[in-house]
Curated annotation (Swiss-Prot):
Cellular compartment(s): Synaptic cell membrane; Cell membrane
Topological domains annotated Extracellular: 31-238
Subcellular location, principal: membrane
Keyword annotations from UniProtKB, A to Z: Cell membrane, Disulfide bond, Glycoprotein, Ion channel, Ion transport, Ligand-gated ion channel, Membrane, Receptor, Signal, Synapse, Transmembrane, Transmembrane helix, Transport
Secretion signal span: 1-30
Cystine pairings recorded for this chain: 159-173
Activity regulation, free text: Activated by a myriad of ligands such as acetylcholine, cytisine, nicotine, choline and epibatidine.
Protein source organism: Rattus norvegicus
Family in the record: Belongs to the ligand-gated ion channel (TC 1.A.9) family. Acetylcholine receptor (TC 1.A.9.1) subfamily. Beta-3/CHRNB3 sub-subfamily.
Name used for this protein in its record: Neuronal acetylcholine receptor subunit beta-3
Gene: Chrnb3
Pfam families assigned: Neur_chan_LBD, Neur_chan_memb
Length: 464
């Protein structure tokens, strides 16, 4: 009896499971059949090329919104902005209505967008020729006739770049959407939300979106008005990369130019250093030329700074050549030192610049008076007493010795004079180096401040 009961329970459970499975399968089959019947009913005689309205005077209201997922690139050279977006579009199709009770309670269906009438909304500022730019995904059709279609799209839109304050610049790029063929009497655009949806936005490493808003407008052509929606993206560049690898090296090069005047003029590296700095600046200019657009309307901030430094370095080379020329002057090169140069560069300016003349200046006695006196005494003695032959020989020897001493004295004085002139010109060159060191240092600091401070103030102000 117990065994029979067990067999009965097992058979009952098996039959119950089979009944549930058959019921579920029948339910699914019923839903599929209802959906198939609904699609045949909706698209029987449906013409996607005709506006789905009851009356020809009716206007289809398209609710339009934009969701940005990624700011792919901002190309200043070609003045392009590349974005990945979702286009939110919703309208009512009067030909796609049904009673859910007649089709198993189906309230919505997914339909390929190629089979539906579409408002042919395109991006007007397209730069790559793909005006539609979107993927033909499926649309959701509700029983009330409401069609919701949110295709993803990748756009390259034209954007006029203002690189005046590069790399502390801010750009305002816009995306203008509208129907390509329908005017305002057929299709009207209505903004879902004036703000661009950025919930799923993937941050860009170079640019930051400060603001992104949409605004509706109308473009008139004769008697017709064409509605459109313009989304404005306010972008701010993150300047850390360019500050570290462009601006700071340029600042370093400008201060290297100042250090040229700290090198001794005896060294031959003064001109080599200046020339190397000039070549480095030329390389930086080539790098910037590859980044910014080729425009004659504005000069970018970093371009102004590099131009300033190049003029700065060129002047330093000219001044260095002049200082080296002064350093190697002497009386033998027919450059005697004028009295005013001695007073200014050997007496006054060294005191003001806290410089000390390393030369120990001393003067030799003239010796002309002593020579005349000696000659007079010798002649007097010869007149007073008649000299013997031995005395005459001794006097002649002494006169020759005196002449030799005078020659040596004149030679020593001449060498001392030449050495003193050479050292004086070298000291004048040192004074000039010190003067130009301070002048170029002040000019470098003030020039950097005057060029960059306004841009930094603007960038910080916009940040706050």
């Amino acid at each position: 009896m117990t065994g029979f009961l067990r067999v009965f329970l097992v058979l009952s459970a098996t039959l119950s499971g089979s009944w549930v499975t058959l019921t579920a399968t029948a339910g699914l089959s019923s839903v599929a059949e209802h959906e198939d019947a609904l699609l045949r009913h909706l698209f029987q005689g449906y013409q996607k090329w005709v506006r789905p309205v009851l009356n020809s005077s009716d206007i289809i209201k398209v609710y339009f919104g934009l969701k940005i997922s990624q700011l792919v690139d901002v190309d200043e050279k070609n003045q392009l902005m590349t974005t990945n977006v979702w286009l939110k579009q919703e309208w009512t199709d009067q030909k796609l209505r049904w009673n859910p009770e007649e089709y198993g309670g189906i309230n919505s269906i997914k339909v390929p967008s190629e089979s539906l009438w579409l408002p042919d909304i395109v991006l007007f500022e397209n730069a790559d020729g793909r005006f539609e730019g979107s993927l033909m995904t499926k649309a959701i059709v509700k029983s009330s006739g409401t069609v919701s279609w949110t295709p993803p799209a990748s756009y390259k839109s034209s954007c006029t770049m203002d690189v005046t304050f590069f790399p502390f610049d801010r750009q305002n790029c816009s995306m203008k959407f509208g129907s390509w063929t329908y005017d305002g009497t057929m299709v009207d655009l209505i903004l879902i939300n004036e703000n661009v949806d950025r919930k799923d936005f993937f941050d860009n490493g170079e640019w930051e979106i400060l603001n992104a808003k949409g605004m509706k407008g109308n473009r008139r052509e004769g008697f017709y008005s064409y509605p459109f929606v313009t989304y404005s993206f306010v972008l701010r560049r993150l300047p850390l990369f360019y500050t570290l690898f462009l601006i700071i090296p340029c600042l370093g090069l400008s201060f290297l130019t100042v250090l040229v005047f700290y090198l001794p003029s005896d060294e031959g590296e003064k001109l080599s250093l200046s020339t190397s700095v000039l070549v480095s600046l030329t390389v930086f200019l080539l790098v910037i030329e590859e980044i910014i657009p080729s425009s004659s309307k504005v000069i970018p901030l970093i371009g102004e700074y590099l131009l300033f430094i190049m003029i700065f370095v060129t002047l330093s080379i000219i001044v260095t050549v002049f200082v080296i020329n002064v350093h190697h002057r002497s009386s033998s090169t027919y450059h005697p030192m004028a009295p005013w140069v001695k007073r200014l560069f050997l007496q006054r300016l060294p005191r003001w610049l806290c410089m000390k003349d390393p030369m120990d200046r001393f003067s030799f006695p003239d010796g002309k008076e002593s020579d005349t006196a000696v000659r007079g005494k010798v002649s007097g003695k010869r007149k007073q007493t008649p000299a013997s032959d031995g005395e005459r020989v001794l006097v002649a020897f002494l006169e020759k010795a005196s002449e030799s001493i005078r020659y040596i004295s004149r030679h020593v004085k001449k060498e001392h004079f030449i050495s003193q002139v050479v050292q004086d010109w070298k000291f004048v060159a040192q004074v000039l180096d010190r003067i130009f060191l301070w002048l170029f240092l002040i000019a470098s600091v003030l020039g950097s401040i005057l060029i960059f401070i306004p841009a930094l103030k603007m960038w910080i102000h916009r940040f706050h």
